Regions:
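Terminal amphipathic alpha-helical/low-complexity segments used for targeting or macromolecular assembly
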Residues: 1-61, 226-284
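Extended beta-solenoid/beta-helix repeat architectures
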Residues: 47-158, 173-174, 183, 189, ...
Length: 284
């Protein structure tokens, strides 16, 4: 052991400020701050420009353009973008369809599409997503589809999630009480009045699904319910109004291959083995 405590004094260090996020709902709180930091990063790296030609062409529908970074994008007619409350960052290859309203702070990732008549604010949308309806204070990871009408608020959504048309979450209790979140057998006091749902990778919901405040849906779950589903659905679960059962792992893997192939992506052996091991673990 060559460690010498006396040498610690000679080590150069720099104090930095960090934010510790213990839970996913902590990340939602810092959407605005993180997008502000990202704007500085993008501007410094020169990855996205101010796109002056775009601003000149669309000046009547853009508010506070100095707080926007727009890449090589397709913006259809009658899109309103308001960066008064925070930056709007639109990455390359994004399509924003007609009659959509975007409010900062907002980041839309590379290759994503925003459907017509959408309203999106204070959110982070990952790459290659298809987004529609209303979003407020939501983090969505890559390749997730929420194409159709419906509301998502104060929520964290994983990758490769597919929301059926009309899927909507509640982010406020009728009695304005603080929302609790159950994960496995433990209940957490979030101390938040506004809180939506936490959806794992590869979750699918049927049309018209109603998601309660503080709901947690485990990765690989399939939700088919005309009523409010359970607020705590375990991983790889087939959920219906008749009850819960385990998703067949071979069928799940087959669906993942099909889904990714449609988007030009491979479901590789590492990820497949991860889910097979996960299935064996939850079956015990």
């Amino acid at each position: 052991n060559n460690f010498n405590p006396k040498k610690i004094k000679s080590i150069k260090f720099k104090r930095i400020d960090i934010i510790l996020c213990r839970y996913l709902w902590d990340i939602i709180d810092y959407i605005g701050k993180n997008i502000n930091d990202d704007k500085k990063y993008f501007a410094h790296q020169g990855k996205l420009s101010g796109n002056s030609k775009f601003f000149e062409k669309n000046s009547k529908k853009l508010i506070n353009t100095q707080n926007m970074l727009i890449g090589r994008v397709e913006i259809q007619p009658n899109v309103v973008m308001d960066a008064t409350s925070g930056p709007i960052i639109i990455d390359d290859n994004v399509t924003i369809k007609s009659n959509t309203h975007l409010e900062g702070p907002l980041y839309v990732g590379n290759g994503s599409t925003i459907s017509p008549l959408s309203y999106v604010k204070n959110s982070v949308i990952g790459p290659m997503c298809k987004i529609g309806g209303e979003l407020n204070s939501v983090v969505i990871e890559g390749y997730t589809n929420k194409v159709h009408y419906g509301f998502l608020g104060n929520s964290y959504i994983g990758e490769w999630v597919n929301f059926g048309a009309g899927t909507t979450n509640s982010n406020l209790k009728n009695n304005y009480g603080k929302v609790r979140v159950q994960m496995n057998d433990e209940v957490f006091e979030t101390n938040r009045i506004h809180l939506g749902c936490f959806i794992g990778d590869y979750v699918k919901t049927s049309i018209g699904t109603k998601i309660n405040t503080g709901s947690v849906y485990g990765p690989g779950s399939m939700i088919f319910s005309k009523d409010f589903p359970s607020k705590n659905i375990p991983i790889l679960t087939w959920y219906t109004d008749s009850g819960m059962s385990r998703v067949g792992i071979d069928k799940f893997i087959l669906n993942c291959h099909r889904m990714k192939k449609r988007r030009g992506v491979d479901f590789d052996i590492v990820e497949e083995q991860f889910y097979r091991n996960l299935f064996l673990k939850v079956e015990k």
